Amino acid sequence: MPPRLLLTSGEPAGIGPDLCVLLSRRPFPCGITVLGDPDLLESRARLLGVPIELRRVVSGDVVPPHEPGVLHVLPTRRQPGTAPGKLDPANAAYVLETIADGARACLAGHYDALVTAPVQKSVINEAGIAFTGHTEFIAGITGGSPVMMLAAEGFRVALATTHLPLAEVSRAITVERLTGVLGVLHEDLVRRFGFSRPRILVCGLNPHAGEGGHLGGEEITVIEPVLARLRQDGMDLTGPLPADTLFLPHNLDRADAVLAMYHDQGLPVLKYAGFSRAVNITLGLPIIRTSVDHGTALDRAGTGQIDTGSLEEAVRVAMEMATGRPAESP
């Protein structure tokens, strides 16, 4: 049976509904069900001038491989009157309901992977609902130890810390955290991506990886001891390496993944290499979850002036993870 993917439609005022509609024009060798408001999707399709046939389904319905012009929809109702580019805190509950329903449906085995469209964190918080992001919200439902990894143009970058102020990163790099993150990264590269013994390059925290302790001591006190212990367990780990040279081609050619210590250490390089096709992947969950690596682009909602490459790649990677074998790019 082809993989069964569930796609959330994201913030209704943003480009999430547009992405779902535009995705309907492409064939995919998997079943794709969109979780969202059918009226919203039909309205956005008319605005974009995209002919579309919506077929309503219930959770767990087997849908055929994705065919152009057809969108299978698992209905969830939003507040009426949503307009492209116009945020409304009243829709926060709808947005979170689609994510929660999607996570639960995958956890129940109705779908093989969850693919998420972008949401607007600020408007959810304005509605009085504390929300830091998809990753933490989904993990609160499914359990697990989430690790953020992005992939683009043939290489993968995972993060030891995610959305932290730079002043707090050093304190967050602990033996416990680093051991846990590397364990999740190694396990999911084996379990989800089919590597028998993944090769992981590990960044240092400080310039020049600490320069032997002259530019910071975290490499000596935390990173090196963790790597030494995990190598004894059979992991193929190289580092800590200076981030300014780690990302050179001759290093990446011998790596299956890179672990960066903080957000802006690793992600700018990856996004430069392939921003329009970068994919956000959450490791360490009992379900598969991929996402686009861009925001809601409120100014482009309803215009048709958007790039679907990141969503198409998120679908491809979800298929790859669900089947354990490479999926061709759409």
From Swiss-Prot:
Catalysed reactions, semicolon-separated: 4-(phosphooxy)-L-threonine + NAD(+) = 3-amino-2-oxopropyl phosphate + CO2 + NADH
UniProt cross-references to InterPro entries, sorted A to Z: PdxA (IPR037510), PdxA_fam (IPR005255)
Keyword NAD set for record: yes
Keywords: Cobalt, Cytoplasm, Magnesium, Metal-binding, NAD, NADP, Oxidoreductase, Pyridoxine biosynthesis, Zinc
One of the protein's GO biological processes: pyridoxine biosynthetic process
Binding site for a divalent metal cation: 163, 208, 263
Transmembrane residue ranges: none
EC number(s) given by UniProt: 1.1.1.262
Annotated pathway: Cofactor biosynthesis; pyridoxine 5'-phosphate biosynthesis; pyridoxine 5'-phosphate from D-erythrose 4-phosphate: step 4/5
Principal localisation: cytoplasm
UniProt remark on cofactor binding: Binds 1 divalent metal cation per subunit. Can use ions such as Zn(2+), Mg(2+) or Co(2+).
Subunit relationships: Homodimer.
NCBIfam families found in the cross-reference section: pdxA (TIGR00557)
HAMAP family: PdxA (MF_00536)
Function description: Catalyzes the NAD(P)-dependent oxidation of 4-(phosphooxy)-L-threonine (HTP) into 2-amino-3-oxo-4-(phosphooxy)butyric acid which spontaneously decarboxylates to form 3-amino-2-oxopropyl phosphate (AHAP).
Family: Belongs to the PdxA family.
Note: The active site is located at the dimer interface.
Identification of the protein by name: 4-hydroxythreonine-4-phosphate dehydrogenase
Gene this chain is encoded by: pdxA
